[in-house]
Amino acid sequence: MAVKIKICGITSLADAWAAHDAGADAMGLVFYPGSPRAVTPQQVAQWRGDLPPFMTVVGLFVNATAQWIASTTALCSLDRIQLHGDESPAQCRAWGARAIRAIRVAEAADLHDLARWPVGALLLDAKIKGSYGGTGACFDWQLLGQAELPKPWILAGGLDPDNVEAAVRQVQPYGVDVSSGVESAPGKKDHNKMHRFVAAVRRAQDGAGL
């Protein structure tokens, strides 16, 4: 099965189409005002109908209310919901299989009991104090060799065109997620880097027989 590729932090229709043309499977929209890549539901609603067809649209939320997630999901026709804050398993349960739960990783203990999350997939990101992602930092991928990963899982945190090939070969994830690693500036995607990133993932999976 091909490794799935999600490009997060899309802030414009042009970047959405560039991600599609590069070969990404999914795009992420950040509905978190604290991020330099934040968009509003009203912005997205204006160009949602012009987004590439057959591309999964993921909305990223950080400690948002269930009501706001629901209204944003409806207005923007989101396919998946990524919960990237301090949400509990009970809060995740409301969204079921359409939810992706971000797990911030710094040590082996952060990967214990992942089966408790009632979601469709897990996203493993670097744990940086005071941050909810998008830092460009990696975590120690060797920790994954000791972990039980009961659901489809997505590798995130510090990935870029230069290291993602090695990452995919080493840990063989269901998918990879990139944001700052394919930017020219926060919130502005570098279209050449997106093409290079996707090409590196495909080289890795071809070499590993994935």
Swiss-Prot record:
Its EC number is 5.3.1.24. It catalyses: N-(5-phospho-beta-D-ribosyl)anthranilate = 1-(2-carboxyphenylamino)-1-deoxy-D-ribulose 5-phosphate. Keywords: Amino-acid biosynthesis, Aromatic amino acid biosynthesis, Isomerase, Tryptophan biosynthesis. This is N-(5'-phosphoribosyl)anthranilate isomerase. One of its GO terms (biological process) is L-tryptophan biosynthetic process. It is an enzyme of class 5 (isomerase). InterPro entries: Aldolase_TIM, PRAI_dom, RibuloseP-bd_barrel, TrpF_fam. One of its GO terms (molecular function) is phosphoribosylanthranilate isomerase activity. The keyword Isomerase applies. It comes from Magnetococcus marinus (strain ATCC BAA-1437 / JCM 17883 / MC-1). It holds the Pfam family PRAI. Belongs to the TrpF family. The keyword Transferase does not apply. Pathway: Amino-acid biosynthesis; L-tryptophan biosynthesis; L-tryptophan from chorismate: step 3/5.
